[in-house]
């Protein structure tokens, strides 16, 4: 029998649990604004705007300084390294802006995906080297949670046992290092929506992946109450011809979570996985209305599904600032309702809100 060598003091555990609960308090979710410089380039390019540091700063400021209606909706904001050290026009560092609105500051700490040799195009995620030192510095600079993304693909022979095991272990090492530094880890094992697989296949793979992730977290002595999970919803592949209702997607998603995610986990913050803004809200709402026992907060950690309409409305023009913020506020309010099972689609979502945000083989 293994002997217990406590990884964390009671004080450390309380701090981690408190942070996790603040992020997913009722009605709150996460704004994922942690696109890498390469990823934000694609977003800016789509509106004909140059990818300069100032444009990136201005756009992030637009989101972070939206009016106080978003305060009850946004429990945390995930930033990219560059953004953590940028300032608003009034001279306040962005972390201070986020905290002044009741949000917790998060930071993306992985260094991207790399190929796993000998597999059919599968990947693992790099960034463990020097992570402890980086976490210690980020904590000093105001960040209280972190995100690390692993990616798995559904194919005829994927995900392989190797890819599942390797990614589960790298997530567990990352989580351990974060917790030692007082940072709540968001564990993100994303199963991509690419492919023609049906709902059942996605559910099966999601269950296998999550079971492996929580086995690894246990092996690495992770304090689950001080973690959040950022999974995909269980959906059919983008090329699947069969159509499913929002209720079927919700039932498959909640069932997969119930079979694999311990109730000790504080919250589940779904990624939007290229769903349209409207679809991401409707599915989140259906998940929260699903008639099964759900012991965790079930909320959002959306990037494009909170930003797409705002980005379009902004169009890279300073004079569109207010209009863009209005679009962002709309989505934040919609998702705040959805994570409480109280969202009723108005039926008048703009064209941008209903547009699929799917990017094949999506790499941040």
UniProtKB/Swiss-Prot annotation:
The record marks 73, 108 as: Essential for substrate cleavage. One of its GO terms (molecular function) is fructose-bisphosphate aldolase activity. Pathway: Carbohydrate degradation; glycolysis; D-glyceraldehyde 3-phosphate and glycerone phosphate from D-glucose: step 4/4. Disulfide bonds: none annotated. Its EC number is 4.1.2.13. The modification N6-acetyllysine is found at residues 42, 108, 111, 330. The modification Phosphoserine is found at residues 36, 39, 46, 132, 272. The modification N6-(2-hydroxyisobutyryl)lysine is found at residues 99, 147. Changing residue 43 to A: Reduces activity 14-fold. InterPro entries: Aldolase_I_AS, Aldolase_TIM, FBA_I. Changing residue 230 to M: Loss of activity. The modification N6-malonyllysine is found at residues 111, 312. Changing residue 190 to Q: Reduces activity 20-fold. Changing residue 35 to A: Reduces activity 14-fold. Signal peptide: none annotated. Changing residue 129 to V: Alters protein-protein interactions, leading to a dimeric protein. In vertebrates, three forms of this ubiquitous glycolytic enzyme are found, aldolase A in muscle, aldolase B in liver and aldolase C in brain. Alkylation of Arg-43 inactivates the enzyme. Plays a key role in glycolysis and gluconeogenesis. In addition, may also function as scaffolding protein. Belongs to the class I fructose-bisphosphate aldolase family. This is Fructose-bisphosphate aldolase A. The lineage of its organism: Eukaryota, Metazoa, Chordata, Craniata, Vertebrata. The gene is ALDOA.
């Amino acid at each position: 029998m293994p002997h217990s060598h406590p990884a964390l003091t009671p004080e450390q555990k309380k701090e981690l649990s408190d942070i996790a609960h603040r992020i997913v308090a009722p009605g709150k979710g996460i704004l994922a604004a942690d696109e890498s410089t390469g990823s934000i380039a694609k977003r800016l390019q789509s509106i004909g705007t140059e990818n300069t540091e100032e444009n990136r700063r201005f756009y992030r400021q637009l989101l972070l300084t939206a009016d106080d209606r978003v305060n009850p909706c946004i429990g945390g904001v995930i930033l990219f390294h560059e953004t953590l050290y940028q300032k608003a026009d009034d001279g306040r560092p962005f972390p201070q802006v986020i905290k002044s609105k009741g949000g917790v500051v998060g930071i993306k700490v992985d260094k991207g995906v790399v190929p796993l040799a000998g597999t059919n195009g599968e990947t693992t995620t790099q960034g463990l080297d020097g992570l402890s030192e980086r976490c210690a510095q980020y904590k000093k600079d105001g960040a209280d949670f972190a995100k690390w993304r692993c990616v798995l693909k559904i194919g005829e022979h994927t995900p392989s046992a190797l890819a599942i095991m390797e990614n589960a272990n790298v997530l567990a090492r990352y989580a351990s290092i974060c917790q030692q530094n007082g940072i709540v880890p968001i564990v993100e094992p994303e199963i991509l929506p690419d492919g023609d697989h049906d709902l059942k296949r996605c559910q099966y793979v999601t269950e296998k992946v999550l079971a492996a992730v929580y086995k690894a977290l246990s092996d690495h002595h992770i304090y689950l109450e001080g973690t959040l999970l950022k999974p995909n919803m269980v959906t059919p592949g983008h090329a699947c011809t069969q159509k499913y209702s929002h209720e079927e997607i919700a039932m498959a998603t909640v069932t997969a979570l119930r079979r694999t995610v311990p109730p000790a986990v504080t919250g589940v913050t779904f990624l939007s996985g290229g769903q349209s803004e409207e679809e991401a809200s409707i599915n989140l709402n259906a998940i929260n209305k699903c008639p099964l026992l759900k012991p965790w907060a079930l909320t959002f950690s959306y990037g494009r599904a909170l930003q797409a309409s705002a980005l379009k409305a902004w169009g890279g023009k300073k004079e569109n600032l207010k209009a863009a913020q209005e679009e962002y506020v709309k989505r934040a309010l919609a998702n705040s309702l959805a994570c409480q099972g109280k969202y009723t689609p108005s039926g008048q979502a703009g064209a941008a809100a209903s547009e699929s945000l799917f990017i094949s083989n999506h790499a941040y």
